[in-house]
Every structure is written in C-alpha cells, then in structure tokens.
C-alpha cells in the first residue's frame, strides 16, 4: 500500500477541514466579571483578628512581628468567605497543624465554584450574548480538589449546555491567571467560533492556620492572600456591533526559572495547604523578568521596546517587594504599576484571580478617563503571572479603543 501524500484527495480534505476549524483572527478579551465574598477585614486590624480567632493572643512578640508584616504589605483591606463566628466552628482549621483537610474541603468544594459562577454571570451579562453560545469553560483554583471537579460544578450552576468543553486547572498558584489566559487563547484561535469562559476562583481558607514561631512563611501568606473570583469571555473574530473586544491576546509564553523550585512551594497536607517561601522570591523574579519580556516580543517578530515605560503593565502583585524590585529592574515610572497597586490595596493577593482584577481595573479607569485605548491609552502591554516553580507567565496584549 502506498503512503498518502499531500496531493491525494484525502489529504487535501483533511487540510481543508483543518483550515476551516481555525479562527481567522487573534483571540480577544470580550468581557470581564469579578466577585468577592461579603466579609471585609481591614489590614490594620488583621493581626488582632488573626491572633484572636486562632487563640494565640498569648504570643505577644509574634503578634507584634506579624502586625509589622501586615503594615508593610501595602494592603488596605481583604475580602473573605469567613468571619469570626464562622471560624469558631472549626478550631482544627485555626490551629497550626491539626488534621483539618476534610473541613477545609467541605467549605471550598461548594464555595469555589459558587464564587466563580458569580463572577461568570457578570462577565456573561457584559458580553451580551446567550450563555448557550459558550463553547469552552476553563476553571482554575488552588482552593481544594474534588471529582466531579470545579469546572463541572460551575457549568452546572451556570446552566451551560451539556456539551460545553470543560477544562480544570488545580493547584497552580499565583501565576495561574496567565496560564488560563494562555489556554483560552489557544482554544479560541484553534476552534472557529469558539467562545471561551475562563474562570479563576480562590478561597484562602484552604491555607488558613494559626501562627507558629518557627514557621513565619505561613504567617506571611496569611498577611497577603484574600478571596476573590474573576471571569473573562475570550474569542476570536468578534461579531461587529454585538461583541466589544478590549484586548487582543497576541502571544502567551510560560518560563520556568531553573533551580528555583524551593523559592516558593506549597504542599497539601492533612492540616491544609502549607506555604513555604524564601526571601529570594523578589530577586529571583526581577533578575529573570527582562529575558521573558524580550522572548515574548521576539517570538512574534517584534523588536522589544528600548524603554519599558512605553507599555501598559498588568503584573501579578505577589507582594510589595516583588513589585518594587521588578519596577526598579525595568526602570519603570511609579505610575506604571498603578492598576496593580490599586488592586493589591483594595483586595490583597487573590492568587490566580488577581491579574484579571487588574485587567478589569485598568480597562474601567481607561474608559472613565476617556483614553484612546483600554490599556491606559497605550497600544501594547504585558500581563505577568508569578508563582511556584518559579514560573513566569508572560502575555503580550494589544489594546483596542473603547466602543
């Protein structure tokens, strides 16, 4: 039997099918929705709250140290799905290392998809098309694991059609907002007519625990992380007059920094999600960020800008030190991280959902100020995810004018 060549009718049919399956244009962000739980705790009072609910007020010196950590975070307040009365029912969760994973999962398994669905409803409403037109769902969380997974539960809550193509991304941490955008780009561009609902939802009770003198890492995590969810509608070839694209997702790349996996790592144990971080996290990211930026520009045949201030910026706010050191390394003006610092102040670090909140903050402020594009009036920008591995997600965005 002879081999098939490109000239055979069958191969031509396959090539035609493949061409017809692909979209003509670049993936675009068409709508954004966000949601957060009702309980607000100010950062100024968080040390009092934290040491009270964990029955640790006798640890006077540790509390003073934790309060200093909180005051340096540049966070004003955070939202949580718990309050003091709620936590009184779970003394195992507020201990440092008592077995508590079952209780944490009992809270997160229904809570994560519900919060994600709340954000998704807002994105779908802004999009303005029927939810039956959603072809793909990508759901991301670090708030527990279960089967059927959170994507299934979110689709069920939203009433999406039963043949929606679902994807679930568990336990990726703080870089995952960029990861989900990378998935959404590939799905939208390789499936003609696809409309991808991407959802990131996080509940930090999976990692909440009492303070321990010999484990300051978890205390740092408790000073930073907040609860929240964000959803985007992503698709190529927008329908003129119906869909309103804001950003084109031009390129999406992931980079793992060699020999850095011990810088930030987390482990799911019987006592919940344990957080470990060294003081090298900010330097590790800032020392490698420029190479990632150069790579993403060169991969699409563009010359990297001589001045990084010519771009708009959506970096994940892993913490104040990370933002400060990246800003210094790239010689950025302070206002370039304005949207990120606003979200950090208003919500804290919401893990995977954070960069999507920042995208929302930027486009809303740009539109309100009457700027020429949703990207602070600029044409090109980058979205950056930082997290365990150490992993960097670099997304090259092209901003469009408000309509």
Curated annotation (Swiss-Prot):
Matching InterPro entries: Chalcone/stilbene_synt_C, Chalcone/stilbene_synt_N, Polyketide_synthase_type-III, Thiolase-like
Phenotype when changing residue 207 to G: Turns into a octaketide synthase
Residues annotated as binding CoA: 281, 318-321
Annotated pathway: Secondary metabolite biosynthesis; flavonoid biosynthesis
SUPFAM superfamilies per record: Thiolase-like
Residues under site feature: Determines the polyketide chain length and product specificity: 207
GO molecular function list: acyltransferase activity, transferring groups other than amino-acyl groups
CDD domains associated with the record: CHS_like (cd00831)
Organism domain of life: Eukaryota
Assembly and interaction partners: Homodimer.
Note: A.arborescens is a medicinal plant rich in aromatic polyketides, such as pharmaceutically important aloenin (hexaketide), aloesin (heptaketide) and barbaloin (octaketide).
UniProt similarity note: Belongs to the thiolase-like superfamily. Chalcone/stilbene synthases family.
Job of this protein: Catalyzes the iterative condensations of 6, 7 or 8 molecules of malonyl-CoA to produce various aromatic polyketides. Produces the heptaketide aloesone, the aglycone of aloesin, from 7 molecules of malonyl-CoA as a major product. Also able to produce a hexaketide pyrone, a heptaketide 6-(2-acetyl-3,5-dihydroxybenzyl)-4-hydroxy-2-pyrone, a novel heptaketide 6-(2-(2,4-dihydroxy-6-methylphenyl)-2-oxoethyl)-4-hydroxy-2-pyrone and octaketides SEK4/SEK4b.
Name this polypeptide is given: Aloesone synthase
The species this protein was found in: Aloe arborescens
């Amino acid at each position: 039997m002879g081999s098939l060549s490109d000239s055979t009718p069958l191969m031509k049919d396959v090539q035609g099918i493949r061409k017809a399956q692909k979209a003509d244009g670049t993936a675009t962000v068409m709508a954004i929705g966000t949601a957060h739980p009702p309980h607000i705790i100010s950062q100024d009072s968080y040390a009092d709250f934290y040491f009270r609910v964990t029955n640790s007020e006798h640890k006077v010196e540790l509390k003073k140290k934790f309060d200093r950590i909180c005051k340096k975070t540049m966070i004003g307040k955070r939202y949580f799905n718990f309050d003091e009365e709620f936590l009184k029912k779970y003394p195992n969760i507020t201990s440092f290392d008592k077995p508590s994973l079952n209780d944490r999962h009992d809270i997160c398994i229904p809570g994560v998809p519900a919060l994600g669905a709340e954000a998704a409803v807002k994105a779908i409403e802004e999009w303005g098309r029927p939810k039956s037109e959603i072809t793909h769902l990508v759901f991301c969380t670090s708030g527990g694991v279960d089967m059927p997974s959170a994507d299934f539960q979110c689709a069920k809550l939203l009433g999406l059609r039963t043949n929606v193509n679902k994807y679930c991304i568990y336990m990726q941490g703080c870089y995952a907002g960029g990861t989900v955008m990378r998935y959404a780009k590939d799905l939208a561009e390789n499936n003609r007519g696809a409309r991808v609902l991407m959802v990131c939802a996080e509940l930090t009770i999976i990692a909440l625990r009492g303070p321990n003198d010999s484990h300051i890492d978890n205390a740092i995590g408790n000073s930073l992380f907040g609860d929240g969810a964000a959803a985007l509608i992503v698709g190529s070839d927008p329908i003129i007059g119906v869909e309103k694209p804001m950003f084109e997702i031009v390129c999406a790349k992931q980079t793992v920094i060699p020999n850095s996996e011990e810088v930030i790592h987390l482990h799911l144990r019987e006592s919940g999600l344990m957080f470990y971080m060294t003081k090298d996290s900010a330097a590790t990211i800032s020392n490698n960020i420029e190479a990632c930026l150069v790579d993403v520009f060169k991969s699409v045949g563009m010359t990297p800008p001589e001045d990084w201030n010519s771009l708009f910026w959506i970096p994940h706010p892993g913490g104040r030190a990370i933002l400060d050191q990246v800003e210094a390394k790239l010689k950025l003006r302070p206002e370039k991280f304005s949207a990120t610092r606003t979200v950090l102040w208003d919500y804290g670090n919401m893990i995977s959902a954070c960069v999507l909140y920042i995208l929302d903050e930027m486009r809303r402020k740009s539109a309100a100020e009457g700027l020429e594009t949703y990207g602070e009036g600029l044409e090109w920008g980058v979205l950056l995810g930082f997290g365990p591995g150490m992993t960097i997600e670099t997304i090259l965005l092209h901003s469009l004018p408000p309509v």
